[in-house]
């Protein structure tokens, strides 16, 4: 299957390969070929760093193999594509390529996480002329979206790709006009990403560690305080599972930042909340900061270790292996 699946036309849900072939003139003018299954998975960091940079990272699996692509958000040709079958995680694991460089530069210390998976079937069709020569190749794509939080897969609108055949541009133009003007089928969006995210119930950029609350001039101090503290609590809670799973060091970092900001808010916003309540929760959040501190210290040491190695003569770089083992063993306890 051609890895470019996000261009062409959107079809009604009830148009399958046989009906499409009939609409294009029947068996003598449109021949149905093989069908193949494929999957497509979108990736980004937990805090949407690739999205913020206007990039999309995806992994396509088809009978021909597995391919990772980095594309501009507005669609079009990929910036780079590399063959890579393992599940995506750390950019450093990717083959040496522009793709790895670009992704690593944006993600820094963050890991790639799956956003949603598209599973589908691609059916090849051939449009024939009077001499039974193929003048346009078609791919009918039926797809469904799977994602964490969805009880069942959600079906996307079928897509029809038009693949040009050398020497038959006029036939391609004629068919394109027929599908858009006679059938009134809309052009598919240049990027599948937005449709997949909507089906998965995700909003790109729906997480940021930055405090972002809207306070109204007519709010009471108590209401404003609750708004701030609820936002901080939401940030803290969203980072708990990633911290426990040790997906990357930024989950714990963001959890601790939200903790410190909560303690600061409790200290600086005075005479709004009951004093005994403030005292109680200041102690609770102080405890949270204390118990997570040692692990964060280990994270910082491990993040800085490559820089420490680079500062040593080449013959001495391996001398830090024992320190790294010690830090990782302590981190895993």
Task: State the predicted function of each range.
Residues 1-333:
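Cationic, histidine-enriched alpha-helical/coil surfaces that engage anionic ligands
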């Amino acid at each position: 299957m051609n890895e470019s699946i996000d261009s062409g036309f959107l079809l009604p849900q009830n148009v399958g390969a046989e009906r499409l072939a009939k609409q294009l003139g029947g068996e003598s003018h449109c021949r149905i070929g093989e069908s193949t299954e494929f999957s497509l998975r979108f990736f980004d960091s937990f805090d949407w760093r690739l999205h913020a940079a206007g990039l999309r990272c995806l992994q396509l699996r088809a009978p021909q193999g597995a391919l990772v692509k980095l594309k501009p958000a507005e669609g079009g040709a990929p910036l780079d594509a590399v063959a890579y079958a393992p599940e995506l995680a750390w950019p450093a694991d990717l083959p040496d390529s522009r793709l790895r460089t670009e992704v690593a530069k944006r993600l820094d210390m963050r890991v790639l996480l799956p956003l949603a998976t598209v599973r589908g079937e691609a059916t090849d069709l051939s449009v024939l002329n009077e001499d039974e020569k193929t003048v346009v190749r078609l791919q009918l794509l039926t797809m469904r979206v799977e994602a964490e939080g969805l009880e069942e897969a959600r079906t996307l609108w079928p897509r029809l790709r038009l693949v040009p055949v050398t020497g038959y541009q006029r036939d391609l133009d004629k068919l394109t006009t027929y599908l858009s003007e006679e059938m009134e089928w809309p052009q598919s969006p240049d990027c599948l990403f937005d449709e997949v995210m909507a089906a998965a119930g995700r909003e790109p950029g729906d997480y940021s560690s930055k405090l972002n609350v809207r306070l109204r001039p007519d709010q009471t101090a108590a209401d404003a305080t609750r708004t701030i503290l609820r936002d901080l609590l939401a940030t803290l809670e969203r980072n708990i599972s990633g911290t426990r799973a040790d997906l990357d060091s930024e989950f714990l970092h963001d959890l601790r930042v939200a903790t410190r900001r909560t303690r600061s808010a409790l200290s600086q916003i005075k005479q709004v909340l009951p004093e005994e309540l403030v005292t109680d929760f200041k102690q609770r959040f102080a405890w949270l900061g204390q118990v997570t501190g040692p692990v964060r210290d280990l994270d910082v040491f491990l993040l800085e270790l490559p820089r420490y190695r680079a500062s040593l003569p080449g013959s001495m770089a391996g001398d830090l292996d024992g320190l790294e083992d010690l830090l990782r063993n302590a981190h895993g306890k």
